[in-house]
Amino acid sequence: MAKELIGNDWDKVLDPVFASDKYHELHNFLKEEYSNKRIFPDMYHIFTAFKLTPFNKTKVVILGQDPYHNPGQANGMSFSVMPGTPLPPSLRNIYKELYDDVGVRPVNHGYLKKWADQGVLLLNAVLTVPYAHANGHQGKGWEDVTDTAIKALSERGKVVFILWGRFAQNKIPLIDQSKNFIIKSSHPSPFSADRGFFGSRPFSRCNTALLNFGETPIDWQLSETVNKSDLA
């Protein structure tokens, strides 16, 4: 097996990718990028989503595109930001729908680790991004890693995939819909939230699907505050 990069069962699932020439190229590219540019998240948090939510514990996938590209935001989990960082507009809209859907009180931080700890894989399709350059690492090799993860989860089955926006929905061909459940709508971005995201009730629908799979539903309520000991 290639060197353990994650430290749980994802290493075995992703080993064929980590051992590939394509990943070796990505690794060398990232070494150069991190040496010469500001890249987010920091290299210690690239695999946070996988570390917090092991393969066999994953019940839900919320798929993002790539990390936030401004300082202090990206933490290795899709849509999540570090405590103390202003909420990005998409996350504000997620909280609004969360309240309208299941009555969850909005909190003043955007740190979503509590969801990850319950089996929600907060996965970006591309795991790194240069400062102020959205999609700057697209097509460099991360898609091999994350597509492999999606396909492996699909094959295992009983996973709810929450796909917001066209980019995420382009991954539908990777998912066996006879064994899994897909929830899709427009993206929560202010540019598209009014075109189908608001009112789509993804959180209650997710929990209904989990119950149908015989799984425990997600407690979507986040803690009011985040302690240092809670940080990944």
UniProtKB/Swiss-Prot annotation:
GO terms for biological process: base-excision repair, AP site formation via deaminated base removal. GO terms for cellular component: cytoplasm. It catalyses: Hydrolyzes single-stranded DNA or mismatched double-stranded DNA and polynucleotides, releasing free uracil. The keyword Cytoplasm applies. Coiled coil: none annotated. The active site is at D66. It is an enzyme of class 3 (hydrolase). It is found in: Cytoplasm. The keyword Cytoplasm applies. Its EC number is 3.2.2.27. SMART domains: UDG, UreE_C. It comes from the Bacteria. Keywords: Cytoplasm, DNA damage, DNA repair, Hydrolase. GO terms for molecular function: uracil DNA N-glycosylase activity. Its main location: cytoplasm. PROSITE patterns: U_DNA_GLYCOSYLASE. Excises uracil residues from the DNA which can arise as a result of misincorporation of dUMP residues by DNA polymerase or due to deamination of cytosine. NCBIfam families: PRK05254.1-1, PRK05254.1-2, PRK05254.1-5, ung. PANTHER family: URACIL-DNA GLYCOSYLASE. Belongs to the uracil-DNA glycosylase (UDG) superfamily. UNG family. This is Uracil-DNA glycosylase. It comes from Lactobacillus helveticus (strain DPC 4571). The lineage of its organism: Bacteria, Bacillati, Bacillota, Bacilli, Lactobacillales.
